[in-house]
Design a protein with these regions (language model features):
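An amphipathic, aromatic/His-enriched active-site/gating alpha helix that lines ligand/cofactor pockets
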Residues: 21-34, 54-86
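Residues that cap or initiate secondary-structure elements
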Residues: 11-13, 55-57, 90
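Short, surface-exposed ligand-recognition loops at beta-strand->loop->(often short) alpha-helix junctions
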Residues: 8-18
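Residue-level detector of flexible, active-site-proximal loop/helix-junction positions
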Residues: 41, 75, 91
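Short alpha-helical linear motifs
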Residues: 42-44, 85-88
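Short, low-order "capping/linker" segments at domain edges
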Residues: 87-97
Length: 97
C-alpha cells in the first residue's frame, strides 16, 4: 500500500534527509520503503514523503515506534503537523523499468 505523508520541518530538509539516511533500515524493518521524499523548491520546510508499506500492520508498527518518532523530532520533523493519506489501491509507482 502506498502512503503519502506531509509534514512541516523546523530545521529544513537537510537534517531530515541525513536522519532518514541513517535510519532507513528502521523503516525497512517495519515493512516500509521510501518511494519519494522532497520539498517544494521555494520552501524546504514543507516535506512530502511517499512510502510503500507491506500491510496496514506494517504502517501501524512504523507509526507506533516511539524511538524512531523521537529521532524524527530531533531532526526537525514537527510530527503534530503531519497529515497521512492512504492512497487508492489502484495507485501505482512505475509501469516500465
Amino acid at each position: 500500500m502506498l502512503v503519502k505523508m506531509e509534514i512541516d520541518l523546523a530545521k529544513g530538509f537537510a537534517p531530515w534527509k541525513e536522519m532518514f539516511i541513517q535510519n532507513e533500515h528502521r523503516l525497512n524493518a517495519h515493512g516500509g520503503k521510501l518511494v519519494f521524499a522532497g520539498t517544494p523548491s521555494d520552501n524546504e520546510n514543507k516535506l512530502t514523503v511517499i512510502m510503500y508499506f507491506e500491510s496496514m500492520e506494517s504502517l501501524k508498527n512504523f507509526g507506533s515506534d516511539e524511538e524512531l518518532t523521537k529521532t524524527r523530532v530531533e531532526a526537525g520533523a514537527m510530527v503534530e503537523t503531519g497529515v497521512m493519506t492512504i492512497m487508492n489501491e489502484a495507485s501505482f509507482i512505475c509501469t516500465k523499468s
